[in-house]
């Protein structure tokens, strides 16, 4: 199976400007690039599709490039936005780009270039003369993402973004023999601008490999962008998102959607190999074979086997009722999505008063009944005496209360 058919079968490709040129670009080992926006300090789970596809394209024979938007990030891409993006300062974009560069070096196996290098020594007059002349205003006004913003207002900076990204493609074409640009489905307008600028400068006959392709937007069954939990984006930086949260997010995806995710994310295994896994999953959905496979796969890919081992340890502690095996920090991660009550560690509590303030039940009568039934545990210890004094260590960050088999209540200690 050729690589285009492979990516289509996996539901990755949305649009290709010219399939014949794309096949020729591979045959002649031309360059392909994907751009990465440094508006945040880390890549997130949604960025993994272009990263994994870039790795795949290198494997099949393309020369691959990852372009950091150190220049374009200073303006902000208006694609898919209904209002003006907040401008970030140079220092912040530069710091973000440096952090993301480290991630791209780890994940992409591509040559990494910051597009700020294209513009630092360029003056405005040369840009308008050499690049601005390649595009007319009518062409830009026909772009859907610009047309949709005209009525509500769009700054000249964001209006010009399309030309600047087009110039990126032109520069890479001239300096690195990059013939293919890839991006999310919202990048189609920017990609085609670059193609048209290069064709206008060099002509159709001299651009036999020039093309672009976009990836299908990854939406969950509710129609929301995949890669965002209730707590926000799931970052690849473990200091921003603990690997356990990524594992849990993947593990909790529904049975049909997880199949689509496996097809898109696991490009280092053939569709035939993956089909065996999927059939085993469909034969016994309760075991969640597919969810566990992809959760393990992505945590190991993003982080390491050691991180995955820690995630497994945290899961085991939770399900085997051995939370004492975890540090307070690990407990905070495990219960990140749970509601929490803050209490003063310097305050003295009897167990029943503590449970009432932790909102385990609405009354002391109900709490006494639960304790008599053996249904209350505090930090893995079964409670038998509602009048006992609660002991809190000076360095203790939280207390975990378990009611019954599955209901948890979290108290965070302050003071």
UniProtKB/Swiss-Prot annotation:
One Pfam family of this chain: SYY_C-terminal
Reactions catalysed: tRNA(Tyr) + L-tyrosine + ATP = L-tyrosyl-tRNA(Tyr) + AMP + diphosphate + H(+)
Residue ranges of domain S4 RNA-binding in the record: 350-414
GO molecular function: ATP binding; RNA binding; tyrosine-tRNA ligase activity
Binding site for ATP: 228
Major place of residence: cytoplasm
E.C. code: 6.1.1.1
PROSITE patterns registered for this protein in UniProt: AA_TRNA_LIGASE_I, S4
CDD domains found in the cross-reference section: S4, TyrRS_core
TM ranges: none
Motif 'KMSKS' region mapped to chain: 225-229
Coiled coil: none
SUPFAM superfamilies assigned: Alpha-L RNA-binding motif (SSF55174), Nucleotidylyl transferase (SSF52374)
Residue ranges of the motif 'HIGH' region: 38-47
GO biological process, one term: tyrosyl-tRNA aminoacylation
Alphabetized UniProt keyword annotations: Aminoacyl-tRNA synthetase, ATP-binding, Cytoplasm, Ligase, Nucleotide-binding, Protein biosynthesis, RNA-binding
Positions annotated to bind L-tyrosine: 33, 161, 165
Record note on quaternary structure: Homodimer.
Protein function: Catalyzes the attachment of tyrosine to tRNA(Tyr) in a two-step reaction: tyrosine is first activated by ATP to form Tyr-AMP and then transferred to the acceptor end of tRNA(Tyr).
Family: Belongs to the class-I aminoacyl-tRNA synthetase family. TyrS type 1 subfamily.
Name this protein carries in UniProt: Tyrosine--tRNA ligase
Species assigned in the record: Mycoplasmoides gallisepticum (strain R(low / passage 15 / clone 2)) (Mycoplasma gallisepticum)
Gene that this polypeptide is encoded by: tyrS
């Amino acid at each position: 199976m050729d690589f285009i058919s492979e990516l289509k079968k996996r539901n990755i490709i949305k649009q290709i400007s010219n399939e014949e040129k794309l096949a020729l670009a591979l045959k002649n080992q031309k360059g392909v690039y994907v751009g990465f926006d440094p508006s945040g300090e880390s890549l997130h789970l949604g960025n993994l599709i272009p990263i994994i596809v870039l790795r795949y394209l290198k494997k099949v024979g393309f020369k691959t490039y990852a372009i950091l938007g150190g220049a374009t990030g200073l303006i902000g891409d208006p694609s898919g936005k209904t209002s003006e993006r907040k401008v970030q300062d140079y220092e912040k974009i530069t710091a973000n780009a440096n952090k993301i560069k480290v991630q791209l070096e780890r994940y992409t196996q591509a040559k990494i270039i910051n597009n700020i290098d294209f513009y630092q020594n360029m003056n405005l007059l040369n840009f308008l003369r050499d690049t601005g002349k390649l595009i007319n205003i009518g062409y830009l006004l026909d772009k859907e993402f610009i047309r949709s913003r005209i009525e509500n207002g769009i700054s000249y900076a964001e209006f010009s973004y399309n030309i600047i990204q087009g110039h990126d493609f032109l520069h890479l074409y001239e300096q690195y023999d990059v013939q293919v640009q890839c991006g999310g489905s919202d990048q189609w307008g920017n990609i085609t601008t670059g193609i048209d600028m290069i064709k206008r400068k060099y002509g159709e006959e001299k651009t036999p490999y020039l093309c672009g392709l976009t990836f299908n937007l990854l939406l969950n069954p509710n129609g929301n962008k995949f890669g965002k939990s209730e707590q926000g984006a799931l970052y690849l930086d473990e200091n921003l998102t603990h690997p356990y949260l990524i594992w849990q997010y993947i593990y909790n995806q529904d049975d049909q959607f997880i199949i689509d995710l496996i097809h898109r994310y696991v490009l280092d295994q053939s569709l035939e190999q993956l089909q065996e896994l999927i059939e085993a999953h469909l034969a016994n959905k309760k075991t969640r074979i597919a969810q566990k496979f992809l959760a393990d796969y992505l945590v190991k890919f993003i982080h390491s086997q050691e991180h995955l081992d820690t995630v497994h340890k945290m899961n085991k502690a939770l399900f085997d009722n051995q939370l004492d095996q975890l540090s307070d920090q690990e407990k905070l991660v495990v219960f990140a999505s749970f509601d929490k009550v803050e209490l003063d560690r310097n305050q003295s509590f009897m167990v029943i008063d503590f449970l009432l303030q932790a909102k385990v039940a609405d009354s002391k009568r109900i709490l006494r009944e639960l304790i008599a039934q053996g249904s209350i545990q505090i930090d893995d210890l079964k409670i038998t005496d509602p009048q006992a004094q609660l002991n809190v260590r000076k360095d203790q960050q939280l207390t975990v209360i378990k009611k019954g088999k599955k209901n948890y209540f979290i108290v965070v200690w302050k003071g």
